[in-house]
UniProtKB/Swiss-Prot annotation:
Main enzyme class: translocase
The protein's name in its UniProt record: Aliphatic sulfonates import ATP-binding protein SsuB 2
Species per Swiss-Prot/TrEMBL record: Xanthomonas axonopodis pv. citri (strain 306)
A GO molecular-function annotation: ATP binding
One Pfam assignment: ABC_tran
Length: 291
């Protein structure tokens, strides 16, 4: 499925950014992938409804990015199929876009020309609409080197959105950003997903991020689905909601291989300031250390 990455240069006709769309259904059946002696994916089955937002989380090396690349067609599964409706997803490649942690902007092209790649004569007008949608409408003539990390990721998101995707795949796109910029980007992604209606599949190592964005979290472990849990919390989601904390604890419990995530102990009365004897100011609860 060439041309799925957000930096693809394959020519296509863009539709107006204001047009609504319907997300693609996604069905993954029996996907297995092996590298040498290592079974990275071992019989993955997933079914994702149109316009759903699903987060895939797991420990490093569990196969989550490999699964996303198989869905995108950048890797070929040894066994199994990836379909959309009654047809292979490969037949819908123009409706699929993939965004990486690295924005992959062309440094010799201005921002607006990076977004307009492959769009033909109407590309600049469509690119301007996409930049407006991600809050960078005035930065079209800037060079990528003049942008912050968060701004470069906004450009990469605009470059994907300008093609009006029906399936948007995000491979840890916010992993290199600072905490506040991550929150801003999370809010932007949710806003655009709700506005445009595409199906969204996000790979992340951040459980809090998964629960902030997704309406379903899938945990991969040892190349298989270990947990599949709904997040029935309406958007917008404020950090610290008890319902989100409960879901995060459930997911973390699975990732840590425990039956229960320890709750922070209630502090005892202190007669002096500072941490208890034997502790340091950096000591935190197990849950906080993971997050």
């Amino acid at each position: 499925m060439a041309g799925l990455a957000s930096g693809a240069t394959t020519a296509c006709r863009a539709t107006p950014m204001s047009a609504a769309t319907t997300g693609l259904p996604l069905r993954v059946r029996g996907i297995a992938k092996r590298y040498g002696d290592s079974d990275v994916l071992r019989g993955i089955d997933l079914e994702i409804a149109p316009s759903a937002c699903v987060a895939i989380v797991g420990r490093s090396g569990c196969g989550k990015s490999t699964l996303l690349r198989v869905i995108a067609g950048l890797e070929t599964a040894d066994v199994g199929t990836v379909d959309s409706g009654r047809a292979p997803l490969a037949a819908q490649r123009d409706a699929v876009r993939l965004m990486f942690q690295d924005a992959r902007l062309l440094p010799w092209k201005r921002v607006i020309d990076n977004v307009a790649l492959g769009l033909g004569r109407a590309g600049r007008a469509q690119a301007q609409q996409a930049l407006d949608a991600v809050g960078l409408g005035t930065r079209g003539n800037a060079w990528p080197s003049a942008l912050s990390g968060g701004q470069r990721q906004r450009v990469a998101l605009a470059r994907a959105l300008v093609h009006r995707p029906r399936l948007l795949l995000l491979d840890e796109p916010l992993g290199a950003l600072d905490a506040l910029t991550r929150i801003e980007m999370q809010q932007l992604i949710v806003q655009l997903w709700r506005q445009h209606g595409f199906t969204l599949v996000l790979v992340t190592h951040d459980v809090a991020e998964a629960s902030a964005l997704a309406d379903r979290i899938v945990v991969l472990e040892h190349g298989k689905v270990g947990l599949d849990v709904a997040v029935p919390v309406p958007h917008p989601r404020a950090p610290g909601l008890p319902a989100l904390a409960s879901i995060q604890a459930q997911v973390l419990s699975r990732l840590l291989g425990t039956t229960q995530v320890p709750e922070p102990a209630a502090p005892k009365a202190q007669t002096r300031h500072g941490p208890p004897r034997g502790a340091t100011a950096q000591d935190t609860s197990p849950l906080q250390r993971i997050l």
